[in-house]
A protein has these predicted regions:
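Short acidic (Asp/Glu) and glycine-rich catalytic loops that position anionic groups and cofactors
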Residues: 1-3, 31-35, 96-98, 185, ...
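Conserved, well-structured core segments
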Residues: 54, 207, 307-311, 334-339
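Helix-centered, glycine/charged polyanion-binding patches within enzymatic domains
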Residues: 154-159, 163-171, 254-331
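Basic, low-complexity intrinsically disordered segments
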Residues: 18-127
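In a subset of proteins, long, contiguous C-terminal domains/tails are tracked
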Residues: 327-353
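Charged, often Cys/His-bearing segments associated with DNA-binding zinc-finger transcription factors
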Residues: 1-26, 169, 345-353
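Polybasic low-complexity intrinsically disordered regions
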Residues: 75, 84-264, 339-340, 347
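Secondary-structure capping and boundary motifs in well-ordered enzyme cores
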Residues: 12, 16, 43-51, 63-66, ...
Length: 353
């Protein structure tokens, strides 16, 4: 008995992945000009950029830790083959070839284009507010350990003799800072802690700008972890928003309650609805801002920014970053936040229909 099957026949008609693939196909269709500029007319056949981006979407949604693990799963997961428009008997990508081709996406800043195209899909559906926003930042642990944090000049701290490669190192009494030390695994990662109640770690800083209507991500950035990174990046993301004639609001936690940030936000055309920090100091905003009902609304809405951060760190696998270097991790962060938006968009499509 001969039976012919395609992956299309095996995916339920009402499976949520169908709605996501439909939006992804539209997004990729808008990026044809970008893809054309990435490849020469001749040369050896390569992994299509559409397949690379679709694979990245699957890796974020299904919490796949590495590119090699994805290629292994692609051998037997028919849903993955369907999402990538592959035949049942079509072999999976070679893991080494797959990883090398993904570097081309980084060179052409494809992650930024993909994120922007997803945001446009949300705007076309009128899911995004253009007046009220929130900003926040978090630390993302780098793919580097404390043992790799060594002096830039001079000998490393003493270790136990004959203890092998993974020997214990005694840092007691040794002053370590980003000025004098750097990670040998990821030199761009910085040793930083967000508060006195948490330990320092080698990390990067992730930043989000969300709107208040449905909590969708308007912009995302990954930078070096510094004391001013959150405020500086928030100002930059706000300035990238299209200008409007009427005044808009931006909410934030107490970390944004500084004179410089409030002044920068006002000059950019926004009213700062940041939480007041009155611990042994005077807040940068006063009753002229906090007396309005909109301020209380912003303080309630700003907590929604924790939802995408939580998703990125758990489902998206970002609690510990998987790449080395700021550029590669930034591209991953852009793609993962775009996937979060994709899931929210398709969920809203179903709820509103």
């Amino acid at each position: 008995m001969l039976t012919t099957l395609s992956t299309e026949d095996l995916i339920p008609v009402d499976h949520p992945i169908r709605r996501i693939r439909a939006v992804v196909d539209v997004v990729l269709g808008e990026m044809d000009a970008v893809f054309d500029g990435m490849y020469a007319a001749g040369g050896r056949a390569s992994v299509p950029p559409e397949a690379l981006l679709k694979a990245t979407v699957l890796m974020a949604m299904y919490s796949i830790r590495s590119e090699r693990a994805f290629c292994e799963r692609l051998n037997y997961d028919l849903l993955f083959k369907w999402f990538l428009d592959m035949r049942i008997d079509q072999p999976a990508f070679d893991a080494t070839t797959f990883s090398k081709n993904r570097k081309r996406l980084l060179e052409h800043q494809v992650a930024d284009e993909f994120f922007a195209a997803v945001v446009r899909q949300a705007k076309l559906r009128r899911y995004m507010s253009s007046d009220h926003f929130s900003v926040d930042g978090t630390l993302l642990e780098a793919w580097a350990s404390h043992m790799s944090f060594k002096p830039k000049d001079g000998p490393p701290p003493p270790s136990e003799p004959s203890a092998g490669r993974n020997s214990e190192v005694n840092f007691k009494g040794t002053k370590r800072s980003n000025d004098t030390h750097a990670s040998t695994t990821d030199p761009q990662a910085r040793l930083y802690r967000k508060s006195n109640n948490t330990g320092a770690q080698l990390c990067y800083a992730g930043h989000l700008l969300i709107e208040h209507r449905y909590g969708l991500i308007m912009d995302a950035e990954l930078t070096a972890a510094t004391g001013r990174a959150e405020r500086d990046c928030a100002t930059e993301m706000l300035r990238r928003l299209p200008g409007r004639n009427r005044r808009r609001t931006v909410a934030g936690d107490k970390g944004y309650d500084t004179k410089d940030f409030v002044a920068d936000v006002r000059s950019a055309g926004f009213t700062p609805h940041v939480a007041q920090n009155t611990s042994n100091r005077k807040s940068a905003i006063d009753g002229r801002t906090t007396r309005h009902p909109g301020y209380d609304v912003s303080q309630r809405k700003r907590k929604r920014v924790e939802e995408p951060f939580g998703w990125v760190k758990t489902v998206g696998g970002g609690r510990k970053l998987r790449y080395i270097g700021q550029d590669r991790n930034r591209a991953w962060f852009k793609m993962t936040t775009a996937v979060y938006n994709l899931i929210r968009i398709t969920t809203l499509d179903t709820a509103i229909a």
